[in-house]
Amino acid sequence: MANPKAKMSKSRRDKRRAQFNARTKAAVTVVCPNCGEPTLPHRACRHCGHYKGRQVTGKSVVA
């Protein structure tokens, strides 16, 4: 049976395991309260540019 040649740090171990978890989890989306489009949480809406109830980018609502 194979034995490790050197100790693997927790950081290196967790980086390796993160690749599996990144592939298995589905992307989470929330509905923008301003325009109703699906968007990523904790980020400005790509459609209307609003975040936390205020305009943060130069886009305007096309509705």
Curated annotation (Swiss-Prot):
Region spans: Disordered: 1-20
Source organism superkingdom: Bacteria
Record's keyword annotation contains Ligase: no
Basic residues bias locations: 7-18
Signal peptide extent: none
Keywords, comma-separated and alphabetical: Ribonucleoprotein, Ribosomal protein
InterPro entries in the record: Ribosomal_bL32 (IPR002677), Ribosomal_bL32_bact (IPR044957), Ribosomal_zn-bd (IPR011332)
Annotated family: Belongs to the bacterial ribosomal protein bL32 family.
The protein, known as: Large ribosomal subunit protein bL32
Gene symbol of the encoding locus: rpmF
